[in-house]
A protein has these predicted regions:
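Structured segments of extracytoplasmic/periplasmic soluble domains
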Residues: 69, 73-84, 116, 151-155, ...
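Conserved SGNH/GDSL esterase-like catalytic core that processes O-acyl groups on lipids
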Residues: 57-62, 66-148
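Sec-dependent N-terminal signal peptides
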Residues: 4-13
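Alpha-helical cap/lid subdomain in secreted, periplasmic
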Residues: 114-252, 264, 273
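Histidine-centered active-site loop/cap adjacent to the catalytic His
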Residues: 234-296
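Immediate post-signal peptide segment of exported/extracytoplasmic ligand-binding proteins
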Residues: 51-56
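Extracellular mucin-like PTS domains
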Residues: 27-47
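Bacterial lipoprotein signal-peptidase II cleavage site
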Residues: 15-23
Length: 296
């Protein structure tokens, strides 16, 4: 019963993103200034030298606005790591409408996802937590995800699939970072188990999870400890706040840091092996590397 409640709460708080205009895009985003410095700190991933030989991938993100900024950032972030020719496709719906089940049950969104897959060039499909069925089944089943996988594989049998975990919305509802992260942290292992069940259903298919939402909690914790010089507000202007609104949409620092988690998930790049992001006083690579150590 406790596990079900944790997963149900995960659904309630993780379907982030206010209801926004739907869109299909092939896009890139923010400029990241860099220096050539690197670090010897290691995580289990590819190094910057190795990345020069990595072919850019075509990635489809289908989901809401607690994942969209990172998808938008991927082309720029991949270039930082020496990866050229990354292609990003996005099918977007706001809030709960961006969960896999909601998108797949919406005929228009479903057709947009299919159209993005139809040329057979998509290497990785990224979806975001959580479908209603996944919650109601206590993390046991999600027909929409299964059908999306089946459709993608029918167009490209080598497609891989990533299930991303965002952060809890409405950050002011939580007294601090520790409370903010509690419910999603509790539900994430069940999400990982669900991904493992998909690999049993599709034995030759790579289905993986990643938890970019954990970056938000790390940044909030640093802010609350007075250790985040780049941020003046919990909620405020995008350039100097963790969140841009009460809903909890990410500010620039959170977007850029979370993008390093996406880079690792998709390309296996160690955050500490890309050039330092010089626009911030904080070394956001260290924050991303810490998240990967905790949740990989």
């Amino acid at each position: 019963m406790k596990k079900f409640l944790a997963f149900a709460l995960l659904f309630i708080v993780a379907c982030g993103g206010a209801i926004e205009e739907a869109s299909v895009e092939d896009t890139v985003a923010t400029d990241l200034e860099i220096t050539s410095t690197t670090s010897a700190i290691e995580t289990t991933s590819t190094t910057i030298d190795d990345s020069k030989d990595i072919t850019g991938l075509t990635v489809l993100y289908a989901g809401h606005s607690f994942g969209r900024p990172f998808a938008e950032n991927l082309t720029k972030t991949a270039k930082l790591a020496g990866i050229k020719d990354h292609e990003q496709r996005i099918v977007f719906r706001g809030g709960e409408n961006g969960a896999p089940q909601a998108m797949w049950e919406d005929p228009t969104a479903k057709n947009e996802i299919k159209n993005a897959l139809n040329d057979g060039n998509v290497d990785i499909v990224i979806l975001i937590c959580c479908s209603k069925e996944l919650v109601e089944s206590n993390g046991q089943s999600d027909k929409a995800i299964v059908e999306i996988i089946e459709y993608a594989l029918s167009k490209n049998p080598n497609t891989k699939f990533g299930l991303s975990m965002p952060w809890a919305d409405y950050p002011e509802n939580y007294i601090d970072a520790s409370e903010h992260r509690l419910q999603i942290d509790a539900g994430y292992p069940r999400y990982q188990q669900f991904a493992k069940s998909l690999t049993n259903l599709f034995p030759d298919v790579d289905v993986f999870t990643f938890y970019h939402g954990a970056v938000i909690y790390e940044l909030r914790d640093l802010f609350e400890k007075g250790m985040l010089q780049d941020v003046d507000n919990l909620i405020g202007p995008e350039r100097n706040s963790i969140f841009t609104d009460k809903k909890g949409h990410a500010g620039l620092l959170a977007k850029d840091t979370g993008s390093l988690i996406w880079l690792n998930a998709i390309y296996g790049i160690n955050p500490m092996d890309i050039p330092k992001i010089e626009k911030y006083k904080l070394d956001i690579r260290e924050v991303a590397a810490e998240v990967l150590r905790k949740y990989s």
